[in-house]
């Protein structure tokens, strides 16, 4: 037996450790590899650079409202391809694909519940559903949210994350801008607070309607907010845009929004503002945070 064969015979192969898919993810901004459970615990905010990643509509609502208080509204409403629209793909096929990918019927989820014990109605966009585009179902669900807030005599909160009106529904989509704005006008007559939270991105017909009609317009850090996108504007005016143009920090300097709030601080900030507006006792900041349930972070992180 040669010396090479003797060495090979004494080698014991080790089993390669397998890491379940989805345990690790990467920050979109700084590129840092992050432990998925830790990121979820931090509400999809990078602990290294504070970049606010996109959050699903349901996780956002569960992180906001008191655990056990959530009741979904308008879940029976489903989109229809009334125009038999087709571009490079049939609209009904795009809907089916988005529904399968996200598990949602459309791009807006509405729930009622309590926030630190205070009754509220909250809506959140699912950006992964066709870019959070606004069609007839989104408009109908938003109006349902407004009507429920009036019925319960409570505030309304909406988290926007949308590319704008849904082109596949043409005029029916554009009509939702007027429909939602008219519904909010009735709510304003009742003197009920409506707080709009602008997240990345809030663009097009959504930013031109109910997203900017809040009694208070709050934005998350570095959120892209506007009508047309920066690239489209640059190509139209043939000029270089200012740094941070259309970002929330730029907008607050120009007086277009009221405040910027980090996501981990959003729940208490909203509750404090609404308590003042509704003449209710201030929320207890020491109360345990309820909401989205994430797996506990192990004592030791798995090896990358």
Swiss-Prot record:
It catalyses: N(6)-carboxybiotinyl-L-lysyl-[protein] + acetyl-CoA = N(6)-biotinyl-L-lysyl-[protein] + malonyl-CoA. Zn(2+) binds at residues 27, 30, 46, 49. Its cofactor is Zn(2+). Keywords: ATP-binding, Cytoplasm, Fatty acid biosynthesis, Fatty acid metabolism, Lipid biosynthesis, Lipid metabolism, Metal-binding, Nucleotide-binding, Transferase, Zinc, Zinc-finger. Residues 284-304 are annotated as: Disordered. One of its GO terms (molecular function) is carboxyl- or carbamoyltransferase activity. A zinc finger (C4-type) spans 27-49. Its EC number is 2.1.3.15. One of its GO terms (biological process) is malonyl-CoA biosynthetic process. It is found in: Cytoplasm. Signal peptide: none annotated. Residues 23-292 form the CoA carboxyltransferase N-terminal domain. GO terms for cellular component: acetate CoA-transferase complex. It is an enzyme of class 2 (transferase). Pathway: Lipid metabolism; malonyl-CoA biosynthesis; malonyl-CoA from acetyl-CoA: step 1/1. HAMAP family: AcetylCoA_CT_beta. Belongs to the AccD/PCCB family. Acetyl-CoA carboxylase is a heterohexamer composed of biotin carboxyl carrier protein (AccB), biotin carboxylase (AccC) and two subunits each of ACCase subunit alpha (AccA) and ACCase subunit beta (AccD). This is Acetyl-coenzyme A carboxylase carboxyl transferase subunit beta.
């Amino acid at each position: 037996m040669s010396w090479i064969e003797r060495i090979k015979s004494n080698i014991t192969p080790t089993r390669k450790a397998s890491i379940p898919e989805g345990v690790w993810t990467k920050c979109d901004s700084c590129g840092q590899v992050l432990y998925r459970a830790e990121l979820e615990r931090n509400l999809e905010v990078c602990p290294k650079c504070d970049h606010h990643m996109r959050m699903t509509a349901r996780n956002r609502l569960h992180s906001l409202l008191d655990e056990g208080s959530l009741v979904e509204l308008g879940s029976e409403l489903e989109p229809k391809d009334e125009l038999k629209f087709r571009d490079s793909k049939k609209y009904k096929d795009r809907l089916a694909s988005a529904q399968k990918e996200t598990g949602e019927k459309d791009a807006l989820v509405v729930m009622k519940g309590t926030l630190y014990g205070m009754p509220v109605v909250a809506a959140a966009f699912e950006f992964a559903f066709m870019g959070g585009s606004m069609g007839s179902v989104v408009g109908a669900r938003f109006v349902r949210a407004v009507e429920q807030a009036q019925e319960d005599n409570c505030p309304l909160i909406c988290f926007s994350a949308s590319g704008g009106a849904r082109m596949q529904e043409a005029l029916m989509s554009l009509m939702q801008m007027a429909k939602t704005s008219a519904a909010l006008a009735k709510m304003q007559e009742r003197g009920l607070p409506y707080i709009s939270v602008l997240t990345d991105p809030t663009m097009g017909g959504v930013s031109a309607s109910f997203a900017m009609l809040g009694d208070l317009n709050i934005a998350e850090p570095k959120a892209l907010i506007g009508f047309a996108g920066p690239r489209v504007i640059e190509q139209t005016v043939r000029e270089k845009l200012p740094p941070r143009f259309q970002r929330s920090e730029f907008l607050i300097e120009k007086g277009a929004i009221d405040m910027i709030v980090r996501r981990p601080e959003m729940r208490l900030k909203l509750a404090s503002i609404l308590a003042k507006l509704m003449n209710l006792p201030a929320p207890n900041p020491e109360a345990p945070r309820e909401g989205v349930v994430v797996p506990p972070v192990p004592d030791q992180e798995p090896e990358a």
